[in-house]
């Protein structure tokens, strides 16, 4: 089986069958991003239910990768595999490997808590702690025993999250008093404070109004300079606006149940304007979902 090479961004990375990739030649002018995370998932199960299979997906450093596809195709399941949040669900198991910076994160000796410091998650619904705005951002630093200037990092993180000017005079107020969009940006600031290398986002704008969505999208584009970002979204316009790479997933009937699988993965303009697979074209044009 041919696998993606480490330091290349393929122009036509796609699944021709359910078990193998077909790769064309890579344009050297585009092969300028290294693979920071590489999913090689043969199968993922919830108890006996096969939720996902045959996913071989490289994630490129300092790029925004979106995972798209209809509900139930395994996008969020795969996202949670990237920092082992699925470990918290009883009777789940992964067959395969997920390689982060050369190490299999599912190796028995790998510490999932340490992993999650390097690969953080922003959820669909904002989840600020019932603490002050300041203490929300400082929380992770204190847990890690950080001994530097916490005030400086709190301010810097809030500025990165485009929130500082809105909250600088009320840092002692309860974070739950903020609007939904502000709470989501606070959650991002809280994560940025501990400087993860990869940020996972599971539909981060689905519960937000258009103005807040625009702010979050601007923030995502800004922070990709220092972070690698992977986003699950059902919003095709959002995926086409903000992402560099797009992976399209769909479902296949297997033994009476629908199992998710990767259909096509390429640069975002290719997926939306000239996809290889007809089913990809139908999905991004809204013919099913």
From Swiss-Prot:
Identify the domain of life.
Bacteria
- Record SMART domains: AAA
Query: Which compartments does it reside in?
Result: Cell inner membrane
Tell me its EC number(s), please: 7.3.2.1
Per UniProt, ATP binds at 69-76
Q: Per its UniProt entry, what is the enzyme's top EC class, as one word?
A: translocase
SUBUNIT field: The complex is composed of two ATP-binding proteins (PstB), two transmembrane proteins (PstC and PstA) and a solute-binding protein (PstS).
Family, per entry: Belongs to the ABC transporter superfamily. Phosphate importer (TC 3.A.1.7) family.
Q: What is this protein called?
A: Phosphate import ATP-binding protein PstB 2
Organism of derivation: Trichormus variabilis (strain ATCC 29413 / PCC 7937)
């Amino acid at each position: 089986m041919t696998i993606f090479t480490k330091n290349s961004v393929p122009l036509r990375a796609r699944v021709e069958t359910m078990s193998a990739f077909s790769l064309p030649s890579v344009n050297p002018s585009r092969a300028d991003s290294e693979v920071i995370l590489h999913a090689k998932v043969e199968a993922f199960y919830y108890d006996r239910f096969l939720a996902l299979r045959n996913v071989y997906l490289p994630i490129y450093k300092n790029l925004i990768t979106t995972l798209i596809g209809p509900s139930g195709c395994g996008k969020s399941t795969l996202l949670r595999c990237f920092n082992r949040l699925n470990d918290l669900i009883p009777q789940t198991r992964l067959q395969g490997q997920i390689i982060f910076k050369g190490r299999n994160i599912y190796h028995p000796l790998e510490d999932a808590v340490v992993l999650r410091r390097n690969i953080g998650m922003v959820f669909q619904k904002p989840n600020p702690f019932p603490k002050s705005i300041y203490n929300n951002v400082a929380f992770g630093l204190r847990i890690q025993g950080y001994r530097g200037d916490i005030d400086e990092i709190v301010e810097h993180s809030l500025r990165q999250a485009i929130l500082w000017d809105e909250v600088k005079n009320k840092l002692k107020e309860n974070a739950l008093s903020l609007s939904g969009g502000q709470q989501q940006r606070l959650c991002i600031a809280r994560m940025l404070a501990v400087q993860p290398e990869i940020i996972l986002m599971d539909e981060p704008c689905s519960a937000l109004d258009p103005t807040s969505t625009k702010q979050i999208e601007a923030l995502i584009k800004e922070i990709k300079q220092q972070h690698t970002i992977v986003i699950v979204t059902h919003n095709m316009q959002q995926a086409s606006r903000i992402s560099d790479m797009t992976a399209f997933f769909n479902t296949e009937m297997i033994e009476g149940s629908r199992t998710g699988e990767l259909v096509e993965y390429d640069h975002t303009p290719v997926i939306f304007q000239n996809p290889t697979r007809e089913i990809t074209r139908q999905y991004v044009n809204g013919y099913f979902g």
